[in-house]
């Protein structure tokens, strides 16, 4: 048999060995896509902190459509604006667990190290419960907690409804009492509230204020106007666009 008949397979075998050796040195396998199994590089942090929006009782994510649209106009992306609906009949402690998952998810998705939480009405209770009871002491992942017409000290209008979340909003309920015990602005976040003397849902209207927070009285706005009013929006935006903890 001619020598060439042996030489060709030998050359092919040598080429295969060289290919396998090169793959081994590079860390890639012929059975997997190049780069598979390598550490995924997280995205760089955005120029501002992402925002989580928490609506109130008998409401939904539709609460925030106007404000979310304004934040987009001012340079925020869809990924940085987390607006979701939840079952408002459940305990605010249960909703706080949902908030915890949403916060961790948006931080992972955006590469950010901190998040701002903007709430309306009852949403203030679950957000504050999350910071106080579900975050480790000294944890800094939440930069700011913003309450618009928050039920921070309860409201007498909550005597008109019966779900557990609503009973938790009643003045001097065990939920509100424990949440406000010792320190109303718990932990490391910046706290800010906006309240209106014309709020027909929060009564007394000053119930929305927090000791230790920056409390801003608005113009004569109704409860649902607090998240629609442009002046309130600009004030909230100017607060959350700050990055005091760095990026």
Whereabouts are the PLM-identified features?
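Residue-level signal for mature regions of secreted extracellular proteins and peptides
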Residues: 18-19
């Amino acid at each position: 048999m001619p020598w060439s008949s042996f030489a060709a397979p030998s050359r092919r075998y040598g080429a295969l060995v060289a290919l396998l050796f090169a793959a081994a040195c590079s860390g890639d396998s012929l059975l997997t896509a190049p780069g598979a199994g390598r550490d995924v590089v997280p995205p760089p942090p955005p120029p501002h902190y992402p925002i989580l929006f928490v609506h109130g009782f008998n409401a939904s994510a539709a609460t925030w459509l106007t404000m979310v649209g304004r934040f987009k106009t001012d340079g925020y992306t869809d990924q940085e604006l987390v607006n979701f609906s939840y079952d408002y009949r459940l305990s605010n402690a249960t909703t706080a667990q949902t908030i915890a998952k949403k916060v961790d998810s948006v931080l992972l998705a955006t590469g950010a190290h901190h998040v701002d939480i903007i709430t309306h009405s009852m949403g203030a209770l679950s957000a504050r419960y999350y910071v106080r009871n579900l975050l480790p002491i000294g944890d800094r992942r939440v930069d700011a907690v913003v309450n618009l017409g928050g039920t921070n000290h309860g409201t007498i209008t909550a005597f008109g409804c019966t779900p557990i979340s609503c009973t938790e909003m009643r003045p001097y309920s065990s939920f509100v009492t424990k949440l406000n015990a010792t320190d109303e602005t718990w932990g490391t976040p910046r706290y800010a509230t906006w309240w209106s003397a014309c709020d027909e849902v929060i009564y007394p209207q000053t119930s929305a204020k927090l000791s230790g927070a920056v409390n801003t009285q608005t113009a004569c706005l109704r409860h649902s106007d607090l998240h629609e009013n442009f002046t309130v929006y600009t004030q909230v935006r100017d607060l959350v666009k700050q990055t005091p903890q760095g990026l």
